[in-house]
Amino acid sequence: MLARQGASVLLLERERFPREHVGESLLPASIPVLEELGVLPAVQEAGFLTKWGATMVWGSDPTPWSWYFRETNQRNPHAYQVWRPQFDQLLLENSRAHGVDVREGHRVVEVLWEDGKATGVRYQSDSGETGTVQCRYVVDASGQTGLLARDLNLRQWDPFFQNLAVYGYFSSAQPLPEPDETNIFIEAYPHGWLWSIPLHTGWTSVGAVVDSATSQNEISTGSLQRFLESQIIQAPHTSRMLRNAHLESGPFIVKDWSYVCERVAGDGYVLAGDAACFVDPLFSSGVHLALMSGILSAAYVTSALKGPGIAEAAAAAYQELYLKEYGHFREMARLFYSSNLTSGSYFWEARRLLEDAGNFTPRQAFIQAVAGQPPRGYERAVLEQGQAPLEFASSVRQVESERERRRVRWEAARSGTDTGEPILAAVPKLAPETQIQRKPILGAGEFVWGTVLTTISQPEGTPCSGLISALVSQIDGARTVGQLLDEVGSLGDPSQASQIRQTALAALGILYVDGTVEELGGL
């Protein structure tokens, strides 16, 4: 993305591709990103298996159950199960095709600084060559190595997800029954959970996620293969699928993998992907977060290079947007862990969300998001298949009930006459901390100044049109709906006044149902 914007980009890659990497299961949210990168046609032609959803043994029912992307994502109803050596090679070649100077086998050993600003890097190649490169921005995409996070002491380990994974690749695994044969399969068992991901190579990626502290001794005193086999045998469905399978590659181990950096952008540098944060892999979020942060960090650097006046604000916008996405996946994973009450083992007991106020808060933004999901959305599946903490489930249902009450009230107020006279006399009042702010928003490959609507549940702000900005700015707790419509209707072309009023009234209804407009006085 940076190269497309005209920047000269040097990519120093430690490995030589293709190389092994875990994280094969993509999400539909990554499809538009791959399209924007220009690599989607190559991904579609690579032969990867189409992933329609997930099948799980989790929660109160020992029978496998499935959810499907099409239930919540009509535009992109599927993703892919990718073989990472091939998939990552496609991404690397796509970078080369767009003008990036890619140097494989080059490891960055040090970031260079001058007066607190990152000014370049020192590297060493696998042939022993060393060198330095001066640059205007350093993008740290070093993954869990976390070069800048280590240098600046930015990484904060997540106390909730203290897990590790042992995984390998099996041939001749039995697939799930149709129509779920290409789904990722996740099975909880007393000491953790297992993933099984079918691949177009004929292999299946299988991994066990276990508690780091309690598993270290067993792993260190035995073989990884015996450890993985001992976990698989505890999961009846997975062990049945692998009954005639053979381990072809691995096992491998990934340790200490849940963390977030307190700062992801600064003077002359930005962190992207796993270098910035990583969350438990339950919802296959790793590749999506990496791709998303690649787009956002490139936009930040482009903006900072074009206009230094926006650099600091764009850095804050990048951090808000990226960490909001990270936070959503984190809270969703925490909710799923806490909902699995089928076992009293240490693994699951240690990952329960307690009801007391000191250890469990409603996390209003996440509750709002979950409450807005269709009944079969995968965020909602935990409420049906597991046993979510009572306070959380109660909060979600309370939000849903309040939204429905508001919708009915709004429709009733509009149905009095054809002109909607009952609603015209109402006096709207904004919820506390609702504001229109000028902030950087994501444009075409860069951050640009724009207008956002900020609320308690969306403090980072939602980009809004001039009409919404004008409407919300006029809501003062004294003007009626009719007066507000007259004012915004007068701001545009007089011939469009009627259409503007109708659009503004519809927008006001959405704001009321959502709670941004807290009250409608006089109704």
Task: Show which residues each predicted segment covers.
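Predominantly flavin-linked oxidoreductase catalytic cores and closely associated redox partners
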Residues: 94-239
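Long, charge-rich, low-complexity alpha-helical segments
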Residues: 123, 455-523
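N-terminal FAD cofactor-binding segment of flavoenzymes
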Residues: 19-61
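Glycine-rich FAD pyrophosphate-binding loop
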Residues: 3-22
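Long, low-complexity, charged/polar intrinsically disordered regions in eukaryotic proteins
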Residues: 383-457
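C-terminal helical "tail/cap" subdomain of flavin- and related membrane-associated enzymes
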Residues: 302-405
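Short beta-strand to alpha-helix junction loop
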Residues: 72-94, 216-223
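FAD/FMN-dependent oxidoreductases across multiple families
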Residues: 216-300, 305-306, 310-334, 341
